[in-house]
Amino acid sequence: MYNIFKGLITALITPFKDNKLDLYALENILNQQIKHKIDAVLIAGSTGEANSLSFEEYKLLLKTSVDIVNNRMPIISGCSSNNTAYAIELAIESKKIGVDCFMASPPSYVKPTQHGIYKHFEALHEACNLPIMLYSAPTRSGVDFSDETILRLSKLPRILALKDCGVDLERPMRIRAIVKGDFNILTGNDEVVLAFHAQGVVGWISVTSNIAPKLCKELLEKWYNNDTQGALEIHQKLLPLYKALFLESNPIPVKYAAYYLGLCENEIRLPLTEASDSAKKQIKKIITSLSIKI
């Protein structure tokens, strides 16, 4: 099975207008990603405010994205839920709609044991034959995969990757030492993208590439072409933007940045609220200094 979990993947924002999905803005955003040759997009993840979507909105968001992209790049759906039956429903619907694969985190809030985490993903794996990426974001979910659980899950044939949002630089090396075969590790933390690539990860799931897809793509291309200095220079240039996009809870800052660039309305759903005036000021200043235009 071809492993598409590699390269630059954008954790896409979900545009809203008047408390509804803004499908016109979605088309513009997706076409910008395709224009800059982003390797794949993640729809309805944390950055995409998945928890605020109704099931009907979730289906509409995926279906519209699949239609717009029209096989021009892979689409990954977010299927995280602390209700295993509902996570399975999301995965099955993703398959029906035509996405290429899906990502899921350990169930949040309920604090399952490692065995419970394994059984959750085993159930997902048995219910839907799409490729699966594990999503490690313990600051959000409250629980994480142990290395041993990752090893067990990697033996299920369609669990092919791990998105690691942490900063433990030893973790990719530990996992690569015990997990054999076609299993990819990607970083989901923009600030440590190069540090993690130096430890053997093969991809980057980025928030920043919503706003600066061209620069993010150039950074990875330079790294993959062994131009370490060139990659470092772009990374240093982007560092203030990485930090600005996490001044407040993601996706609050990136949604404002997208609005400032004319990509969508600055509309975010409760319990999240729009960026503070202080954050807006910093974001505008950094985008202007980088001469980012869409």
From Swiss-Prot:
Main enzyme class: lyase
Stored SUPFAM superfamilies: Aldolase (SSF51569)
Site features described as Part of a proton relay during catalysis, chain residue numbers: 46, 109
Superkingdom of origin: Bacteria
Binding site for pyruvate: 47, 205
Gene3D superfamilies: Aldolase class I
SMART domains according to UniProt: DHDPS (SM01130)
Presence of the UniProt keyword Cell membrane in the record: no
GO cellular component assignments: cytoplasm
Pathway of action: Amino-acid biosynthesis; L-lysine biosynthesis via DAP pathway; (S)-tetrahydrodipicolinate from L-aspartate: step 3/4
UniProt-annotated catalytic positions: 135 (proton donor/acceptor), 163 (schiff-base intermediate with substrate)
Record carries keyword Lyase: yes
NCBIfam families assigned to the protein according to its UniProt record, in alphabetical order: dapA
Protein name, UniProt field: 4-hydroxy-tetrahydrodipicolinate synthase
Organism: Rickettsia prowazekii (strain Madrid E)
Name of the coding gene: dapA
